[in-house]
């Protein structure tokens, strides 16, 4: 009689370290391996405490920016719909304003904003939707932004500037004026369509849907030998704090100096005005002098006539201060880029105004978090003669 040794049948293995999804039958006598993954009914609360310990940048903005004030300004300009006769009630204005700020802080589409609100805990906390069973969908976000329009976003920008003044960050030490190109999707037209558009006519074979998808306001321009298509954003920045104080928009083909007067801030405590080589003109110099401003505009060499050494040194001196205006543009680029995907100049103005507003909001929150004194005057470095005298007496 032949005896066959058989291994006794093993019961299902239900070790939570090895098989957190349920009991399984191991293949052989595998040792129990421990895992760093821990399952807890209170995992959300533990994760929330971890986030608070690490620091949530959105909560810094929520703590230091008065969104109720911003919402009040919007409600005064665009009152909420009356729902006493029925219909779904609208979302609170403070929630929608926070959503728009999130959209432009992260350069998100309306579809991505909806998804991120459903997926990200930090977005839900910032928009006061942590305990909400529903969030605004993409259509709600789009319609709300359209309802605000240029007037609503301009009011948001001005209300943010009012908060700057409330905290003492007034425009000081002069102002810097500059413009930047804001690219937009390139439009393609046939020769016949372009000829009609140049005459101010719309091709008859365009359907209403096709017309809505064609941006007829954006223009082309060339800069440093490279072609651009889109719009232009002109801003005025105060030298001391680098907040955007004035803003206006135009098309890419417009010259930088076209909107100089619109972004000139008469509320700055200093009368110094800085600008690059695209702004000098005899008429502008006379205008600034008549208004009591001190002109610091870099000179551009005429064709065939180089600048003198004195003019070159003056340009270098101005450039040290004028370079501060490039920081807001770089920060906007860091927030997701300046490319806009809207149709028409009105919507482009809304997008560019929101970019500038979000830049000021983010910078103000950082200033208040770090305790930056609005009236702090940095100590100047000692002169060479003072250094030599101190060394000789040592």
Label each PLM-derived region with a short phrase.
Residues 50, 66, 87-93, 133, ...:
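Secondary-structure capping and boundary motifs in well-ordered enzyme cores
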Residues 124-143, 295-297, 303-311:
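Phosphate-backbone recognition surface of nucleic-acid-processing proteins
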Residues 95-107:
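Alpha-helical support elements that line or immediately flank enzyme active sites
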Residues 2-76, 367-394:
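Charged, often Cys/His-bearing segments associated with DNA-binding zinc-finger transcription factors
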Residues 286, 291-292, 311-394:
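Basic, amphipathic alpha-helical segments enriched in Lys/Arg and hydrophobic/aromatic residues
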Residues 92, 115-118, 128-129, 136-290, ...:
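Polybasic low-complexity intrinsically disordered regions
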Residues 75-88:
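Short, Lys/Arg-enriched N-terminal segment that forms or immediately precedes the first helix
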């Amino acid at each position: 009689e032949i005896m066959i040794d058989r291994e006794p049948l093993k019961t299902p293995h239900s070790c939570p370290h090895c098989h957190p999804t349920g009991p399984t039958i191991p293949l052989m006598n595998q040792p129990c391996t421990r895992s760093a993954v821990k399952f807890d009914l209170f995992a959300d609360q533990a994760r929330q405490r971890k986030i608070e310990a690490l620091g949530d940048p959105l909560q810094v903005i929520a703590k230091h920016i008065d969104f109720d004030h911003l919402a009040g300004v919007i409600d005064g300009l665009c009152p909420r719909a009356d729902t006493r006769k029925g219909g779904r009630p609208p979302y609170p204005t403070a929630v929608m304003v926070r959503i728009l700020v999130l959209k432009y802080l992260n350069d998100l589409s309306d579809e991505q904003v909806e998804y991120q609100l459903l997926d990200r805990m930090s977005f839900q906390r910032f928009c006061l939707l942590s305990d909400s069973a529903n969030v605004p969908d993409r259509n709600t976000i789009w319609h709300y932004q359209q309802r605000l329009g240029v007037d609503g976003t301009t009011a948001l920008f001005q209300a943010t500037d009012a908060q700057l003044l409330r905290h003492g960050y007034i425009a000081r030490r002069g102002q810097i004026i500059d413009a930047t190109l804001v690219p937009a999707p390139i439009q393609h037209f046939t020769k016949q369509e372009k000829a009609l558009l140049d005459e101010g006519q719309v091709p008859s074979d365009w359907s209403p849907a096709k017309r809505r998808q064609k941006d007829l306001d954006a223009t082309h321009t060339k800069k440093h030998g490279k072609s651009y298509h889109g719009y232009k954003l002109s801003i005025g920045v105060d030298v001391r704090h680098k907040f955007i104080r004035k803003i206006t928009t135009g098309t890419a083909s417009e010259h930088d100096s076209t909107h100089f007067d619109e972004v000139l801030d008469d509320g700055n405590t200093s009368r110094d005005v800085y600008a690059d080589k695209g702004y000098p003109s005899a008429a502008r110099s006379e205008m600034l002098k008549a208004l009591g401003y001190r002109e610091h505009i870099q000179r551009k060499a005429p064709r065939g006539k180089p600048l003198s050494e004195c003019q070159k040194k003056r340009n270098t001196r101005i450039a040290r201060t004028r370079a501060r205006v490039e920081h807001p543009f770089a920060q906007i680029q860091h927030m997701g880029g300046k490319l806009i995907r809207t149709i028409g100049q009105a919507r482009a103005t809304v997008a560019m105004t929101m970019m500038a507003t979000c830049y000021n909001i983010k910078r103000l929150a950082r200033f208040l978090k770090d305790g930056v004194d609005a009236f702090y005057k940095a100590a100047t470095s000692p002169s060479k003669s003072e250094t030599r005298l101190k060394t000789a007496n040592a």
